[in-house]
UniProtKB/Swiss-Prot annotation:
ATP binds at residues 34-41. Belongs to the ABC transporter superfamily. Phosphonates importer (TC 3.A.1.9.1) family. PANTHER family: AMINO ACID IMPORT ATP-BINDING PROTEIN, PHOSPHONATES IMPORT ATP-BINDING PROTEIN PHNC. It comes from Natronomonas pharaonis (strain ATCC 35678 / DSM 2160 / CIP 103997 / JCM 8858 / NBRC 14720 / NCIMB 2260 / Gabara). GO terms for cellular component: plasma membrane. SMART domains: AAA. This is Phosphonates import ATP-binding protein PhnC 1.
Length: 233
């Protein structure tokens, strides 16, 4: 379980996060919604360790998360276009391996097998040798997900992973995320501007408004008014 308690983040006089507390469970995909500037990205960056909160705590199974425990997939993917899909996925293991392996491009055989398996997990098993720069937007996002999984995290975060994709491709990417969260028993959190895309696969919804947690509800108990209230808050 990932436990967030009293999380507060300030930028000057502005509170980007205001006393956020929530427990996130393994095997569940949580969808984070809210208007632009509501605090979604700040929350994900704090969970990933890219930002340090001013107050509050984050614990994974009762301890402080290690760097490799949490993986974050960005909207743009942050991939290297000149490298193959397989090489990009292998980069996800760098937090667990000596840095000289990246410089020389030498990875253990078991890491290569795992990376190929991750590409299969996201539906790109036949794309290992393709340069990322030649892939479509949806394929790039799936490579980014595979790379995050190569890190062997307990927590998988994705910040607006389908914002630049058409609805059909976006649904496919979200279905891939949901599948690996459940199959690998991960804690999954995805922020979205289009919450309807996640309706078939979400387990839980969290809503932020002005840095405050204003919605926490199982997907089965959610109605349209709940989502509307988050954006009207």
């Amino acid at each position: 379980m990932l436990s967030v308690s009293g999380l507060t983040k300030r930028y000057g006089d502005e509170r980007a996060l205001d006393d956020v507390s929530v427990d996130l469970q393994r095997g569940e995909l949580t969808v984070l919604v809210g208007r632009s500037g509501a605090g979604k990205t700040t929350l994900l960056r704090c969970l990933d360790g890219l930002e340090q909160p001013d107050d509050g705590t984050i614990e994974l199974d009762g301890r402080a998360p290690a760097t490799t425990d949490v993986a974050l997939v960005f909207q743009a993917g942050a991939l290297v276009d000149s490298k193959s899909a397989l090489s990009n996925v292998l980069d996800g293991a760098l937090g667990r391996l000596p840095s000289w392996r990246e410089l020389l491009g030498v990875y253990p055989a078991d890491e290569k097998r795992a990376a190929i398996a991750r590409l299969h997990d996201v539906g790109l098993g036949g794309y290992a040798d393709r340069r990322v720069g030649t892939l479509s937007g949806g394929q790039r996002q799936r490579v980014g997900i595979a790379r995050a999984l190569q890190q062997e995290p307990a927590v998988l975060l994705a910040d607006e992973p389908v914002a630049s994709l058409d609805p059909e491709t976006g649904r496919d990417v979200l279905e891939r995320v949901a599948a690996v969260v459940r199959d690998d028993d991960l804690i999954g959190v995805v922020s979205l501007h289009q919450p309807r895309l996640a309706e078939p696969i979400a387990d839980r919804y969290l809503g932020l408004a002005d840095g405050r947690l204003v919605l926490d509800r199982p997907a089965a108990a959610l109605d349209r008014e709940d989502i509307t209230a988050v954006y009207d808050d």
